[in-house]
Swiss-Prot record:
Homology family: Belongs to the DEAD box helicase family. eIF4A subfamily.
Renumbered ranges of motif Q motif: 40-68
Molecular function terms, GO-annotated: ATP binding; ATP hydrolysis activity; RNA binding; RNA helicase activity; translation initiation factor activity
Keyword terms of this UniProt record: ATP-binding, Helicase, Hydrolase, Initiation factor, Nucleotide-binding, Protein biosynthesis, RNA-binding
Protein name per Swiss-Prot or TrEMBL: Eukaryotic initiation factor 4A-11
Family annotation (PANTHER family): ATP-DEPENDENT RNA HELICASE DBP3 (PTHR47958)
Catalytic reaction(s) noted: ATP + H2O = ADP + phosphate + H(+)
Ranges for domain Helicase C-terminal: 252-413
Annotated InterPro entries: DEAD/DEAH_box_helicase_dom, Helicase_ATP-bd, Helicase_C-like, P-loop_NTPase, RNA-helicase_DEAD-box_CS, RNA_helicase_DEAD_Q_motif
EC class (word): hydrolase
Organism field: Nicotiana tabacum (Common tobacco)
Domain of life: Eukaryota
Pfam family name, one: Helicase_C
Length: 413
């Protein structure tokens, strides 16, 4: 049935085990390392002083659920599979694990992180650089749409960590500009998304070029069967860290829907909302690039300052737009799912799904941004007759109830 979550997409330990049993048969018992320690504070994790300084300077106070369980096993050099949604602090989990283990006197690539999109790779590069600020870490993002020669120059001058998209990273390995000899940590972020974008072969090709003894981390919001296959091929007795299904609520985010009889009436509904609410910063999601342009024109025509990004724009333009949005000079960003995972703006208090996503999984990536690390956020979904089924699927998929938008919505923001 169209619109329903694909089987095995929401991470469920029982389902995962059943799938692994199917793949591994009787070896399954020996496959995982059990690790149950939970660390309530960053100070208790035994991290280097300068890494802690970076963590606190970045604004983290208390570790999130995934950080409490995930940082230490990674620091110990264990293979880890971690399942957590966007906005839970998983990027900082593997960044901390990598930064703790680097040999800073050796200016060679020691850690390789793969991500599905340029935006996400650049986001990870930023977090890594900020957390490693007091350690003097050298990080570089190798992504498509940028100068190959510039990549080669930076890699040859020496870096500790490379973050990138599979295509460009493989290219750099093939050209021998990125030398794999000292790489000891390999992380796949948003593994589900990389696989669904058809990067499987490239990931396998990259893995073949890495040293045989390597620590592997797989991070994924969902776990489709292909991700399990990677787990089995690449990993050695991984520690499995689940933020359990009931913790995978979209905690701290109030979710509402607005019934809109006709598609044409969404614009009026949107403008009414902006007139009644004092919104600091908001992101509006639509499903097509053309609609991004259309809605941007309509909003500007009504004197709203809005920014827009989508996949047809070149990288440079997108970077400039995201910078404006982050700095607050533009308060509204209109975009598509493609960029949902690369948006990390701490002040976003409202996400509007002008169009509901076409798959339930993407709902989490969109609205996970409005409630980062315990900040309260609000998401409002515009629902036409045709969307009712998808709204139902989303509620079922995440086990949430999305209520009709109350009249006093202004008090919630």
């Amino acid at each position: 049935m169209a619109g329903l979550a694909p089987e095995g997409s929401q991470f469920d330990a029982r389902q995962y085990d059943a799938k692994m049993t199917e793949l591994l048969g009787t070896e399954q018992q020996e496959f995982f390392t059990s690790y149950d320690e939970v660390y309530e504070s960053f100070d208790a994790m035994g991290l280097q002083e300068n890494l802690l300084r970076g963590i606190y300077a970045y604004g983290f106070e208390k570790p999130s659920a995934i950080q409490q369980r995930g940082i230490v096993p990674f620091c110990k050099g264990l293979d880890v599979i971690q399942q957590a949604q966007s906005g839970t602090g998983k990027t900082a989990t593997f960044c901390s694990g990598i930064l703790q283990q680097l040999d800073y006197s050796l200016v060679e690539c020691q850690a390789l992180v793969l991500a599905p999109t340029r935006e996400l790779a650049q986001q990870i590069e930023k977090v890594m650089r900020a957390l490693g600020d007091y350690l003097g870490v050298k990080v570089h993002a190798c992504v498509g749409g940028t100068s190959v020669r510039e990549d080669q120059r930076i890699l040859q001058s020496g870096v500790h960590v490379v973050v990138g998209t599979p295509g460009r990273v493989f290219d750099m390995l093939r050209r021998q500009s990125l030398r794999p000899d000292n790489i000891k940590m390999f992380v796949l972020d948003e593994a589900d998304e990389m696989l669904s974008r058809g990067f499987k072969d490239q990931i396998y090709d990259i893995f073949q070029l890495l040293p045989p003894k390597i620590q592997v981390g797989v991070f994924s919001a969902t776990m489709p069967p292909e991700a399990l296959e990677i787990t089995r091929k690449f990993m050695n007795k991984p520690v499995r860290i689940l933020v359990k299904r009931d913790e995978l609520t979209l905690e701290g985010i109030k979710q509402f829907y607005v019934n809109v009889d006709k598609e044409e009436w969404k614009l009026e509904t949107l403008c009414d909302l902006y007139e009644t609410l004092a919104i600091t910063q908001s992101v509006i999601f639509v499903n097509t690039r053309r609609k991004v342009d259309w809605l941007t024109d309509k909003m500007r025509g009504r004197d709203h300052t809005v920014s827009a990004t989508h996949g047809d724009m070149d990288q440079n333009t997108r970077d400039i737009i995201m910078r404006e949005f982050r700095s607050g000079s533009s308060r509204v960003l209109i975009t598509t799912d493609l960029l949902a995972r690369g948006i990390d703006v701490q002040q976003v208090s409202l996400v509007i799904n002008y169009d509901l996503p076409t798959q339930p999984e993407n709902y989490l990536h969109r609205i996970g941004h409005s409630g980062r690390f315990g900040r309260k956020g609000v998401s409002i979904n515009f629902v036409t007759k045709d969307d009712e089924r998808m709204l139902f699927d989303i509620q079922k998929f995440y086990n949430v109830v999305i209520e009709e938008l109350p009249a006093n919505v202004a008090d919630l923001l």
